[in-house]
From Swiss-Prot:
Disulfide bonds: none annotated. Expressed by the venom gland. GO terms for molecular function: peptidase inhibitor activity; toxin activity. One of its GO terms (cellular component) is extracellular region. GO terms for biological process: regulation of blood pressure. This is Bradykinin-potentiating peptide 11g. It comes from Bothrops fonsecai. This peptide both inhibits the activity of the angiotensin-converting enzyme (ACE) and enhances the action of bradykinin by inhibiting the peptidases that inactivate it. It acts as an indirect hypotensive agent. The modification Pyrrolidone carboxylic acid is found at residue 1. Keywords: Hypotensive agent, Metalloenzyme inhibitor, Metalloprotease inhibitor, Protease inhibitor, Pyrrolidone carboxylic acid, Secreted, Toxin. It is found in: Secreted.
Length: 11
């Protein structure tokens, strides 16, 4: 289950 991308961590 993939966790949502953290808003403060760029891709």
């Amino acid at each position: 289950q993939a966790r949502p991308r953290h808003p403060k961590i760029p891709p």
